[in-house]
Amino acid sequence: MKNVLPPFIEIYRALIATPSISATEASLDQSNASLITLLAGWFSDLGFNVEVQPVPGTRNKFNMLASSGHGAGGLLLAGHTDTVPFDDGRWTRDPFTLTEHDNKLYGLGTADMKGFFAFILDALRAVDVTQLKKPLYILATADEETSMAGARYFSETTALRPDCAIIGEPTSLQPIRAHKGHISNVVRVLGQSGHSSDPARGVNAIELMHDAIGHIMQLRDSLKARYHYEAFTVPYPTLNLGHIHGGDASNRICACCELHMDIRPLPGMTLNDLNGLLNDALAPVSERWPGRLTVAELHPPIPGYECPPDHQLVEVVEKLLGTKTDVVNYCTEAPFMQTLCPTLVLGPGSINQAHQPDEYLETRFIKPTRELITQVVHHFCWH
């Protein structure tokens, strides 16, 4: 059956040629159904049992779980099927045509991260999955680039508890065992409009927001002073004010002001605790101006994540690669997989190419990635 799989480069080419863009804007958002169908067919050809799950709350998005073997434990290899949108004017190549040039494979999703599935399929064509002593699972998720709805849904509904998981995000084959989380909120202040010639007849939302920002800055300083994780290049939780808008004319009292902000918490900091800290920080403004200040989520929050540094997965991967695990500031689906089993983020390609025009993966990653997948499957599913 394995001989019916296309060659590695043709699998890669087909994945890149199948659009699967995730976007919050409905006009740009695409279903990943065609890509899931491709993957499901190939993993079926390798002897896997394949289950395709609709992801609730999405625009026709699906997860795919391919499994082989029986019993407890085993290994989960995971990745997302979607890409970010692309700026056609900044690409010098067709984003949906795999192009090889100067030892690089160009195309949307080559590094982040549809290409990872080509590596898995290519490595497993030499493995008789029916003879595994422990289960092997391949998970392809939806909407990582926007809501992470696929990973959230899978982690909330599955009964699987593998021994460990590897998410093949582009880390330049540097194993990642921890990263910060991400919380994005909108702070809205509702004032009362009026003519600027008589300020007492209105409530200026910009002035109230100025007061609120002062308290938010105090929270930023408090987070920096109270929480520390030395391994990160920025070893404290960050708080950023990213966007503000209010008012519509210089001679009107501003009736509404809106601030977009984010917090990137360290591993171990709970989302509920952070929401509580933000609400506590803004309480003086809310008490002074009842009913005029609200805080809401802009996007579903992502917690920080950490795999125990002494776990067998860390030890095995560090030995195979001859390098120590690291930590990063960006987010992945790892916090959701970590609720099921210890998880590392580890894959070919550079994060510096993710979300960039003319995205590419260097061909030097092909051989070591194929070898790594073969080795981890052998270690966790044959022993």
Curated annotation (Swiss-Prot):
Keywords, comma-separated and alphabetical: Amino-acid biosynthesis, Arginine biosynthesis, Cobalt, Cytoplasm, Hydrolase, Metal-binding, Zinc
Details of cofactor binding: Binds 2 Zn(2+) or Co(2+) ions per subunit.
Gene Ontology MF terms in the entry: acetylornithine deacetylase activity; zinc ion binding
PROSITE patterns xrefs: ARGE_DAPE_CPG2_1, ARGE_DAPE_CPG2_2
Residues the record lists as binding Zn(2+) 1: H80, D112, E169
Amino-acid positions noted as binding Zn(2+) 2 in the UniProt annotation, renumbered to this chain: D112, E145, H355
A Pfam family per the record: M20_dimer
GO biological process: L-arginine biosynthetic process
Reaction(s) this enzyme catalyzes, per UniProt: N(2)-acetyl-L-ornithine + H2O = L-ornithine + acetate
Cofactor(s) recorded in Swiss-Prot or TrEMBL: Zn(2+); Co(2+); glutathione
Catalytic site positions: D82, E144
Coarse class of the protein's main subcellular location: cytoplasm
GO CC aspect terms: cytoplasm
Places the protein is found: Cytoplasm
CDD domains: M20_ArgE
The enzyme's E.C. designation: 3.5.1.16
Listed pathway(s): Amino-acid biosynthesis; L-arginine biosynthesis; L-ornithine from N(2)-acetyl-L-ornithine (linear): step 1/1
Family: Belongs to the peptidase M20A family. ArgE subfamily.
Function: Catalyzes the hydrolysis of the amide bond of N(2)-acetylated L-amino acids. Cleaves the acetyl group from N-acetyl-L-ornithine to form L-ornithine, an intermediate in L-arginine biosynthesis pathway, and a branchpoint in the synthesis of polyamines.
PANTHER family cross-referenced by the UniProt entry: ACETYLORNITHINE DEACETYLASE
Subunit annotation: Homodimer.
Protein name, per record: Acetylornithine deacetylase
The encoding gene: argE
